[in-house]
Amino acid sequence: MTPQDFYRTLEEDGFSLSSKQKEQFDTYFKLLVEWNTKINLTAITEENEVYLKHFYDSIAPILQGFLANEPIKLLDIGAGAGFPSLPMKILFPNLEVTIIDSLNKRISFLTLLAQELGLENVHFFHGRAEDFGQDKAFRGQFDAVTARAVARMQVLSELTIPFLKIRGKLIALKAQAADQELEEAKNALCLLFGKVIKNHSYQLPNGDSRFITIVEKKKETPNKYPRKAGLPNKKPL
């Protein structure tokens, strides 16, 4: 998917990018490739592949109608090189984006990236989701949490749901069908008062299958969740 293919596909979906937005995606790509020689950000560095498998894939929840251009508070867990939240932010500037990542070098990259792209209302924090999930400044503060290929739903639910407001939504982007994952996550979702409201499949323009699972938070998360760092992965609920 060339940049021109990317712009044209978005226009067909009703999103006509400004010259500024096109420049932001171009700068994003260049900085990603440059920094990838210093720290491991991605295995995908070829331009057409980045536009398809990072940029287009990241904004899929918007294209599929799961997010609007509103000043909601969105948290991205384990965003790595900023996916999916920063491409979303470029497309929908009204989003207020917070990223938590466990690697400080990635936070350094993201901070520079946001400055170079001129993004406002973006915040970056270094640390573990389990620790921030017990911090009152973060717990129960977000309208939406995104996670792209971070962990199986059984683990992901404990890492993300505590951050949501009641009726807030987890938007999980997956490369594989989530049916089996959701079956395994039934107990975790029950304990965390999360309800699956959508399990959506779609295709990238090249025909690759992708999946978006939407989980809504129904009640306050019990205080003991999330457990200490490492436990959700070691002993899933």
Curated annotation (Swiss-Prot):
SUPFAM superfamilies given in the database record: S-adenosyl-L-methionine-dependent methyltransferases (SSF53335)
Family annotation (Gene3D superfamilies): Vaccinia Virus protein VP39 (3.40.50.150)
Keyword field: Cytoplasm, Methyltransferase, rRNA processing, S-adenosyl-L-methionine, Transferase
Compartment(s) of residence: Cytoplasm
Cellular component GO terms held in the UniProt record: cytosol
Keyword Protein transport: no
Keyword Transferase: yes
InterPro entries: rRNA_ssu_MeTfrase_G (IPR003682), SAM-dependent_MTases_sf (IPR029063)
EC numbers, comma separated: 2.1.1.-
Enzyme class: transferase
Main subcellular location of this protein, as a coarse class: cytoplasm
Positions contributing to S-adenosyl-L-methionine binding: G78, F83, A129, E130, R148
One Pfam family hit: GidB
MF (Gene Ontology): rRNA (guanine-N7-)-methyltransferase activity
Function: Specifically methylates the N7 position of a guanine in 16S rRNA.
Family indicated by similarity: Belongs to the methyltransferase superfamily. RNA methyltransferase RsmG family.
PANTHER family named in the record: S-ADENOSYL-L-METHIONINE-DEPENDENT METHYLTRANSFERASES SUPERFAMILY PROTEIN
Protein name: Ribosomal RNA small subunit methyltransferase G
Naturally occurring in which organism (per UniProt): Streptococcus pyogenes serotype M6 (strain ATCC BAA-946 / MGAS10394)
